[in-house]
């Protein structure tokens, strides 16, 4: 990935949580009306990821900088309700989808996305799952994501004020 496409400044803000001894994960859990079929949930996850490449990333560290880069590994649905060690036990992904009984669990690092940012992705997964499992006809609207954070463009658009005698 080109240096200009990397969003190091944004990622730097969140890596303090990533490298803590006690990792902080967010979790949503969804109780469905029937037992979850892991194979269908895997198909739904794969389809959702193909429509939302932002989530198909891994954290890459180079010296003192960290970047999100494409993750070529498969993103798997895991069995059970226990939180997995992310990214060590998730093929490098910064989130995890698992299921047990009638419940789907979704764990993620907050610096990748917040609750508002994760909602369209989770909705897409659940709608795709319901379409596969029950033959529903959810439309699966596109997931909109912002372009990569570009500090140079922001600084050019909003330059720092020049110092004057009154501010010295």
Describe each PLM feature range.
Residues 1-160:
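Non-catalytic N-terminal regions of enzymes
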């Amino acid at each position: 990935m080109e240096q200009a496409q990397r969003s190091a400044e944004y990622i730097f803000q969140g890596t303090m949580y990533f490298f803590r001894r006690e990792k902080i994960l967010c979790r949503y859990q969804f109780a469905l009306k029937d037992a979850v079929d892991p194979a269908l949930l895997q198909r739904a996850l794969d389809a959702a990821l193909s429509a939302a490449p932002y989530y198909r990333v891994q954290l890459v560290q180079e010296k003192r900088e960290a970047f999100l880069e494409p993750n070529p590994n498969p993103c798997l649905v895991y069995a059970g309700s226990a939180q997995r060690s992310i990214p060590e036990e998730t093929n490098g992904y910064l989130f995890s989808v698992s299921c047990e009984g009638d419940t789907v669990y979704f764990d993620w690092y907050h610096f990748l996305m917040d609750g508002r940012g994760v909602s369209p992705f989770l909705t897409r997964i659940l709608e795709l799952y319901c379409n596969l499992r029950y033959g529903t006809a959810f439309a699966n609207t596109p997931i909109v994501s912002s372009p990569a954070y570009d500090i140079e463009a922001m600084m050019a658009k909003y330059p720092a004020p020049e110092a004057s005698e009154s501010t010295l």
